[in-house]
Amino acid sequence: MLHHRLVHSRRAALRMCALVIALLLGMVLTACGSGAEDPAGGSGGDAPGAAAEAPGSPGDAPQRIVSLSPSATEILYAVGAGDQVVAVDDQSDYPQGVPTTDLSGYTPNLEAILGYQPDLVVFSDDNGDLKSGLDRVGVPYLQLPAPGDIEGAYEQFAQVGVVTGHADEAHELVGEVREQISAAIDAAGGAGEGLTYFHELDPTLYTVTSASFIGQVYSLFGLQNIADAASGAGAYPQLQPEFVVSANPDLIFLADAQAGGESPASVAQRPGWAGVTAVRDGQVHALDADITSRWGPRIGDLAQRIAQILADRPGT
Amino acid sequence: MIAAAAAVTFAVLLTATLVGASGLSPSSVLAELADALPLVHIDSGLTTQQQAILWQIRLPRVVLGALVGATLAVAGAAYQGVFRNPLADPYLLGVSSGAGLGATVMIVAGAAGAGMGSLGVPVAAFAGGIVAVAATYLLGRSVGGGRGEVVIILAGVAVAAFANAAQTFVQQRYQDSLQSVYAWLLGRLSTDGWSDVTLVLPYVAVTIAVILLFRRTLDVMSVGDVEAASLGIRPARVRLLLVAVATLGTAAVVSVSGLIGFVGIVVPHAVRLVVGPGHRLLLPLSVLAGASFLVLADVVARTIMSPAELPIGVVTAAIGAPFFLVVLRRGTGMQ
């Protein structure tokens, strides 16, 4: 599981220590959780190659962090490291007032990143050989890839906390989000048990299966994903329209309902969709695309939103 | 010959209508289709929902596949005849790159809240395709100084490269639409019910009709421009007209289906290997074979990863290439 690469740097040993500490902390936190299983599974698989080190004292914590991932940005601010962030990428827009720049996480430009003189770079995907570039110039980094499950997200909160010198706040944050999610599950009161749903990523019917991070959140409520029939095509398959209609989901969630996007009305007008249970019962719901696509501290908000939808459903 | 091919195409379309991800039994689908015939009354036993799946989702998709395949194949055959170049295909003059640019701009604008509804992307793709080919033609004429087709083709290469660069640039700037753009570029027989079919039908009809009208003229022109001119044909005008209608049809079908490769080049060649190079048979058979080929490819796209989709552009290339090599081998053996 753990790919440990040889880091060519004077402080390689220290960094390995930091990695071990961060991982241990993740495990400890996970173990404190509600009977959690081994978090190392899931599609988020690899342990992040955290080349960043845990600060020896609060004064040593990185003070010029550059974040290239909207999820990472949200986590950084949520653990209280916001004051140490100098620049975030063009997709990061939450919380309000983050220092958004034209840096890109998809096509990272090493020179532009180094222009901010970062002492820590946080990113999710190693696009454009970013990692080896940062290695070459000796800038510490922390990679936070999309986790396979919620526990994986909690681990990342903890990691960010350790690396930025906010381990305690991160620990609290994990507790809060856990609390929020279990409260949401209680509020739903089993209303989702056995209901089927379809989570729409875009109008061409790209979706998620239960194996995805977001699919896991739905599973907490006992919801059944119609896309699981297509899990042979990965965690993010594109479903055929006739299958979605014949699977007849009880609920449809739209993650493509931003301005100019889809809406319950536009879904009802699709050929053959008018008779789908979710459309007939008015159970087509627009979700905030940012909240559904990021694995940050707002997972709890998503869980609450789902709970609200289930609780408001007639006949529950 | 043509009647037999038409029967095969009909059989392919019918078979494709029986196959799908929603588990309707083929016999009840057949009964439902027969029930729609005048004076026939059969109870298919399908629910209202299942009938909607058949009539509003599956059948339009099959019909759209037939229209797109027929148009790409006949446009490819026309291009090959006009440019006297066996490697010409309908995308030669930049229509696909232009359409890709138009579609990408509109998808991105839509994500940013342009809100032109579901018509926005096809209209933008269509316009982009037409503009790109017009630019190719005008550039080719202005720099070519009457040096004919080669310069036009090279101008097409330049225009396509430029449009691709612009398309990539736009795509990189707006990462959140990346998946939608990518999916469009790979091609998908859009399933907007009958609206896509009615949208492209006039263009498809005009394109096929005009190209078929000129099938004998193309045969004469293949002998040589001087001989054609002596029979009262004006080759330059015929070429311009045929390129214009082939482009129009291609831009129309690409605007609803995305970029589906390989059909415009493989199908005419496969037909040629069977019936020879004469346009009189080649063009109508390309229409029928193109329709069959793309509908079959879509059946594969719908079944191989069912209930997920496989992009049809992947299928046309994956089944088209080996099939083509087999035909080539048999064809060369026959001569």
Model-derived features with residue positions:
Chain A
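Bacterial Sec-exported substrate-binding components of ABC uptake systems
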Residues: L2-S71, D135, H166-F198, Q308-T316
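A short, structured surface patch at a secondary-structure boundary
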Residues: R64-D126, L223-I226
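Short secondary-structure boundary segments
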Residues: S69, D125-D126, A146, L201-P203, ...
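Short, solvent-exposed loop/turn elements at domain surfaces
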Residues: T73-A78, D93-G97, L205-T209, F253-L254, ...
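Proline-aspartate-enriched helix->loop->beta-strand connector
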Residues: N109-F123, V139, Q240-A255
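Extracytoplasmic ligand-binding site segments that recognize negatively charged/polar headgroups
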Residues: D129, Q143-V160, G192-V217, G260-E262
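Structured C-terminal subdomain patch of bacterial secreted/periplasmic proteins
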Residues: G152-A153, F157-V162, H171, L251, ...
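His/Asp/Glu-enriched short active-site or ligand-binding loop at hydrolase and phosphoryl-transfer sites
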Residues: S212-A235
